């Protein structure tokens, strides 16, 4: 069985997987991601944000449910409190002149907050900046910390491995339900995802 261990809910670094087969990105794969042919999500594309020189072109904050047993529901949150945390981070970005893109997760019960840079910057600088935004965002809404914040991509400061994979947005099947979509301040999917 050559199915990705992550699809079987097994935690494993991609570079350590005996089944890894790095494949070239093709137009067919991009179309499959955007259309969503496969119910099991095996046509979903992801990206390693950490570049070989230790830089990155974007930063992603992942907000989801990391309670015990959450993997059974694809880490979907069970209430809407996570939206307050995402909104706090969004506000901190906007106060500092940054226009983040917020993506509702595939399940519709979590989010990715994307910040793109004009040029590659050291991952350590991006991550320190991200932690500062989280700290300021938490204090702006009187939180001791973000409960639903799970991790930041890239997850490493330096390129000693390929890093962690982040699923790309606009996944065809999820998008049909308004998920895996970029959303506005009212949590509505933008009508034209290509014109944001």
Where would I find each of the regions flagged by the language model?
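DNA replication initiation modules
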Residues: 44-83, 118-196
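Signature for HUH/AEP ssDNA processing cores
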Residues: 1-109, 116-132
